[in-house]
Design a protein with these regions (language model features):
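A sensor for short, sequence-defined functional sites
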Residues: 1-211
């Protein structure tokens, strides 16, 4: 694992560390991780290039004069043997899915770091990024108790985010958060049993079933 750590001062703000150093120290910023990924892919005879983006400007960057100051992030562009284009952000964690459907943020435009390149790549995100919630109420009568079953399906980046939350939250705290959410809408809500989590990593889908 190469941790994402940026030391944004001095020459380190612009110059990458050698890939061997990044691999040995096990950390690096966005440009360090991107260059390392590019070199590793090149060793496998896969065409790859570092690419500069701006995480917030989107298409506004097309209207600005050329300047390195307008880029705040570095990612990777990959060209496979069939000339298909793919984009990867090595700084993202807890990602699942295959290399063909790995989530890539909607940066919209990116500039490949290559002296022969003079125009932007147009980037179209292929991620679904949805949350589907299915709630099933079982009401015996209007005065008695009722039960609620909930199935929430997270896809693409939403699955990545929830995977990160689950990994970095104590189990008891996570269960309490789920229960407290529905306590905002229903009185005397109690979880009947622990939630069931299904992580379908091949398609980057995470399902939480609550009872």
């Amino acid at each position: 694992e190469i941790r994402y750590l940026g030391l944004e001062f001095g020459i380190g703000s612009y110059k990458t560390n050698p890939p061997n150093k990044v691999f040995e120290q096990r950390y690096g910023d966005c440009k360090d991780k991107s260059l390392l990924m590019v070199k590793m892919l090149e060793e496998l005879d896969i065409k790859a290039y570092p690419m500069l983006v701006n995480s917030t400007l989107k298409n506004t960057i097309l209207e600005l004069p050329p300047s390195p100051e307008f880029f705040d992030h570095c990612v990777v562009k990959v060209v496979d043997n069939n000339d298909n284009l793919m984009y990867f952000d090595p700084t993202l964690s807890e990602q699942s899915g295959t290399y063909k459907n790995r989530h890539f943020p909607n940066y919209e435009y990116g500039l490949v770091v290559d002296k022969t390149i003079k125009s932007f790549d147009t980037i179209i995100s292929n991620s679904d990024n949805t949350v589907y919630i299915y709630e099933e109420y079982d009401i015996k009568d209007l005065k008695g108790k009722a039960t609620l079953n909930v199935k929430t399906t997270y896809t693409d980046v939403e699955a990545d985010r929830m995977r990160y939350v689950i990994k970095n939250t104590a189990k008891t705290s996570f269960h309490n958060e789920l229960e407290n959410f529905y306590a905002q809408y229903h009185n005397n809500v109690r979880m009947r049993k622990n939630p069931v989590i299904e992580d379908n990593k091949d398609i980057n889908e995470l399902i939480i079933k609550e009872f």
